[in-house]
Amino acid sequence: MVYKLVLLFCIASLGYSVEYKNTICPPRQDYRYWYFAAELTIGVNYDINSTIIGECHMSESYIDRNANIVLTGYGLEINMTIMDTDQRFVAAAEGVGKDNKLSVLLFTTQRLDKVHHNISVTITCMEMNCGTTKYDSDLPESIHKSSSCDITINGSCVTCVNLETDPTKINPHYLHPKDKYLYHNSEYGMRGSYGVTFIDELNQCLLDIKELSYDICYRE
């Protein structure tokens, strides 16, 4: 008798599982986007002619409310830290523009334009006099002067540097990840721009990133 009851229970359970239908869940409103937080342009005094697939490598960390990213490629090491922040770096991409200019796209978990952050950038020439510090200074924000960015350059290969936070444009052909990054930063008054030049005029360090081809940096 007990055996028959167990058998009937198993059959009933099997029948229920066959009749189960997937529940349609409501759509999410809090999508996990990559935010296009900053674009860094670096001019160098050696030839870089085109974007190389697999050239850029990255590592990132978040310690004591400081978000850090380290990028290597095209003869440079780029180390950037955003101090006292809730967000962290999630991705980066690099592309080569005209006149030996390297463009770096930086993506974070949150937008930068809501709170002014202090930023630290160290650029090291890996193959040309990397032990000599060429530049080490704080740069005030050239648009609104609400935050600062200290830039250290080790080596003699850098001709200019320009950093723009919360850019308002991006290459329309950049599709990593497709439809999951934001760049329509409408609050112009909260954006930042920093720049320093040595050989090139600073306006030569302002690339139109819509014209570049980028490759996403590989995580290490």
From Swiss-Prot:
List this protein's GO terms for biological process: symbiont-mediated suppression of host NF-kappaB cascade
- InterPro entries attached to this UniProt entry: Poxvirus_M2
Q: What induces it?
A: Expressed in the early phase of the viral replicative cycle.
Q: Which residues form a coiled coil?
A: none
Keyword Secreted recorded: yes
Cellular component aspect of the GO annotation: extracellular region; host cell endoplasmic reticulum
Subcellular localization is given as: Host endoplasmic reticulum; Secreted
Post-translational events: Glycosylated by host.
Indicate whether Glycoprotein appears among the record's keywords: yes
Write the signal peptide boundaries. Answer: 1-17
Supply the alphabetized keyword list.
Early protein, Glycoprotein, Host endoplasmic reticulum, Host-virus interaction, Inhibition of host NF-kappa-B by virus, Secreted, Signal, Viral immunoevasion
Family to which the UniProt record says this protein belongs? Belongs to the orthopoxvirus OPG038 family.
The record describes the protein's role as: Plays a role in immune evasion. When secreted, inhibits T-cell activation by preventing the binding of host CD80 and CD86 to soluble CTLA4 and CD28. In the infected cell, may inhibits host NF kappa B activation.
Q: How does it assemble?
A: Homooligomer. Interacts with host CD80 and CD86 when secreted.
Name of the protein in question: Early protein OPG038
Q: Which gene encodes it?
A: OPG038
